[in-house]
Amino acid sequence: MNASLRRISVTVMALIVLLLLNATMTQVFTADGLRADPRNQRVLLDEYSRQRGQITAGGQLLAYSVATDGRFRFLRVYPNPEVYAPVTGFYSLRYSSTALERAEDPILNGSDRRLFGRRLADFFTGRDPRGGNVDTTINPRIQQAGWDAMQQGCYGPCKGAVVALEPSTGKILALVSSPSYDPNLLASHNPEVQAQAWQRLGDNPASPLTNRAISETYPPGSTFKVITTAAALAAGATETEQLTAAPTIPLPGSTAQLENYGGAPCGDEPTVSLREAFVKSCNTAFVQLGIRTGADALRSMARAFGLDSPPRPTPLQVAESTVGPIPDSAALGMTSIGQKDVALTPLANAEIAATIANGGITMRPYLVGSLKGPDLANISTTVGYQQRRAVSPQVAAKLTELMVGAEKVAQQKGAIPGVQIASKTGTAEHGTDPRHTPPHAWYIAFAPAQAPKVAVAVLVENGADRLSATGGALAAPIGRAVIEAALQGEP
C-alpha cells in the first residue's frame, strides 16, 4: 500500500472512531439532557402522541387527556383546576411539570418499567400506547370543604393552607393551598395562552404557584406548645405543675420582656397550673416551662415529632420543618412558644396532631393510594407505614385531654354538635417588624377526640390586624368545617 492510500485509510478510520465516540457520548452521557431539553421537538411530539394516564381521587377525575386534531395529539385537562392544582400540578409543553404530574411522570406517560409488558403488547398489536393511572388518597368532599372554607374565611379568600390526614394510616385526605391557579392555561397548546398565564402567575405577589401546604415553612406560634408540653410531660411534669401567671416575663440574659396575648395575666393568682396555662395558651407560663424543661429535652421531643430531619417525599417534595438554633435561655423561652427560629410546614403541623391522635405513633404521610395500568389493573398499592413512636400512649392521652380543654375555650363558631374535638390554636408573629405585621393564624386538631378519624392543620397567612388574626377567630372555623366534612357519614 502506498503512502497516499495509507493516509486515506488512517483518516477514514479516525473519522469512524470519532463518529462512534460521538454516538456513544450522545447515547450514554447526553441523552437524558437532550430528552429533557424543551427545544427538543421530537421528544415533545413523542410524549404528546401517547394518551397520558389519569389522576383520580375517590372516583373523580382530577386530570386526564383528550384527543385533538392538532400537531400535539393529546391535551391535558383539569376539571376542577384551582381546588386540585396543589395535588396534580400542571403538565405543560413550555413549562415542564409539577406536583404529581412530575412525581409520577413515568407511570402517567407509560415509560415505567412496570408497564414494559404493556408497551411490548402495544408494539406487536399496533395499539396506541397509553400511560398508567394514579389514584390519590384525597377525599373530594374534604378537599372541597377545605377550599371553600379558605375562600370564605377572611371576609373573602384567605392566603394559606389546609392539610387533613387519616391518623391511623397517614393518608393525606386534603391538601389545599390558597390562592391557587388554573393548570389548564399552562397545559394549553397555544403558546400565547401559556406565556400570558405564566407571566400573570409570576407577577402575582400572592405567589399562587407556591404550594403553601408543603413547600413553605412558617412560625407555628402557640401550636408549638403541644411539643413543649409533650417534652415537659415526658420529663416528669404533671398537669398540676405550677407556672407563673404574670402578664409579662423577662427573657433571661436580655432586656426583653415577653407578654401574654393582650398583655393580660393568666389568672387571678400568682401562679397557674400547666393544665390552665395550656387551655388559656399563656405565653409567660410556657416560657418558664420551656426553660425548666431544657433545650435538649425540647429539641429531642421536636425531633421525635419529625422536625429537624428531611421529610420523605409524599411523593411530592416537602420542605424541612426546623426548631432552629437555641443558643441561650432567651432563645429557649421564645422557642417554647413557637417563635424565634421555629418553622413548620402545615403538613408537619398536621402530622403533630395526627401523631397525638394515633396514641403517639407517627405514620408516614402519603398522597398516592395506588398505581394502575392503562387497563386499570393494579400495579401497586400504598399501605400505612409507622415512622416512629414520638411519645408514650400515656403522654398522648394527656395531650388529648389538654387539647379537648383548649378547644372548649377556643370554640367561637363552627361547633359540630355531638363531636368532641381536641385542638390547639396559634397566633404567630413574623417578619422584620412583627409588631406592625399581621400575624399568621394556626389551628391544629383531630376528631372525634377519643376515636380520631381525621387530623387537620390550618394556616391563615397574614391573617388581619393583631387583635382579630388569632387562630381561634380565623383558622379554627376553617378547620372545623374540614372536620365536619370528614365525619359526614361516620357512625
From Swiss-Prot:
Membrane topology qualifier: Single-pass type II membrane protein
Positions on the Periplasmic side per record topology: 29-491
Cytoplasmic-side segments: 1-7
SUPFAM superfamilies in alphabetical order: beta-lactamase/transpeptidase-like
UniProt xrefs under Pfam families: PBP_dimer_2, Transpeptidase
Residue ranges the record marks as coiled coil: none
GO terms for MF: penicillin binding; peptidoglycan L,D-transpeptidase activity; serine-type D-Ala-D-Ala carboxypeptidase activity
Protein family: Belongs to the transpeptidase family.
Comment field on protein domains: The apo form can adopt multiple conformations. The beta5-alpha11 loop near the active site is a flexible region that can adopt a variety of conformations in the acylated state of PBPA and appears important for acylation.
Record PANTHER family: PENICILLIN-BINDING PROTEIN 4B, PEPTIDOGLYCAN D,D-TRANSPEPTIDASE
Its biological purpose: Transpeptidase that catalyzes cross-linking of the peptidoglycan cell wall. Required for the regulation of cell length. Plays critical roles for the survival of the pathogen inside the host. Required for both bacterial survival and formation of granuloma structures in a guinea pig infection model.
Protein name as it appears in the record: Peptidoglycan D,D-transpeptidase PbpA
